[in-house]
Regions:
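Short, basic, glycine/proline-bearing loop/turn elements
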Residues: 12-20, 155-162, 196-200
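Ligand-binding beta-strand-loop-alpha-helix segment within the catalytic cores
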Residues: 62-185
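N-terminal glycine-/serine-/threonine-rich phosphate-binding loop
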Residues: 1-45, 54-64, 73, 177-182
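Conserved mixed alpha/beta catalytic, RNA-binding, or beta-rich assembly cores of soluble enzyme
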Residues: 13-15, 169, 184-200
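Short, active-site-adjacent cap segments at secondary-structure transitions
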Residues: 13-15, 49-53, 115-118, 193-195
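Active-site-proximal beta-strand/loop segments in catalytic clefts of secreted hydrolases
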Residues: 10, 46-48, 111-113, 189
Length: 200
């Protein structure tokens, strides 16, 4: 059977802005295309913390202009980030493969992971997202929206969210089927969107 390779791209590998990301994925695409040329089955995962923070901030700023607008939860911001990072990766990898004469499909799967609803991180969130706020802004976010915030190395305050440990991947069979069918798959961006099981 073919060798399976998981490529994990950290946030520094994706850049801090959209133009930086579009440039950065070209370098990643060359390395990934090398693996495909070596006849490996390739699955790509990636960080999304800066991107989720950017989307979250944009949605918050929009909400300030339009107070009736419902704020997007972190799960939705995470899904948005998986979508646009996957979009850039797909395009860069596909272009690199075609340049090498390889006609291999590339696809992104929006991925959810089952977590324990009592995971410690829900009670002690530590994953920072969004922009740096003043104490006044942070206090307002805590009072109005119930955000958890921490002081960030003396620079100001940041929102913190839970980053629970994944127990299983909901779309795992889809990922397996696509990899076995020969696709290059982008999945589990940001570790996946956390969800938990309920009764019924």
């Amino acid at each position: 059977s073919k060798k399976k390779v998981v490529v994990a791209l950290g946030h520094k590998a994706l850049g801090a802005t959209l133009p930086q990301q579009q440039d950065a994925v070209k370098g990643a695409a060359k390395a990934i295309a090398d693996l495909v040329e070596a006849d490996c089955q390739v699955i790509i995962s990636h960080s999304n913390a800066p991107q989720v923070g950017m989307i979250h901030t944009a949605m918050n700023e929009f909400g300030k202009q339009h107070p009736d607008y419902t704020f997007a939860p972190i799960s939705v911001c995470s899904a948005m980030s998986q979508g646009y990072i996957g979009y850039d990766l797909q395009n860069a990898i596909r272009e690199e493969l075609l340049n090498r004469g390889i006609n291999r499909p590339v696809a992104t799967i929006l991925t959810q992971v089952v977590v324990n609803p009592y995971d410690d991180s829900f009670y002690k969130p530590v994953k920072v997202i969004g922009r740096i706020m003043t104490k006044e802004e942070a206090d307002k976010m805590v009072a109005e929206r119930g955000y958890n915030v921490i002081e960030d190395a003396g620079r100001g305050y940041r929102r913190v969210v839970a980053s629970p440990r994944p127990q299983s991947i909901i779309e795992i069979q889809s990922i397996r089927d696509m990899v076995e069918a020969g696709l290059v798959v982008v999945a589990c961006g940001g570790g996946g969107i956390p969800v938990y099981k309920t009764e019924g």
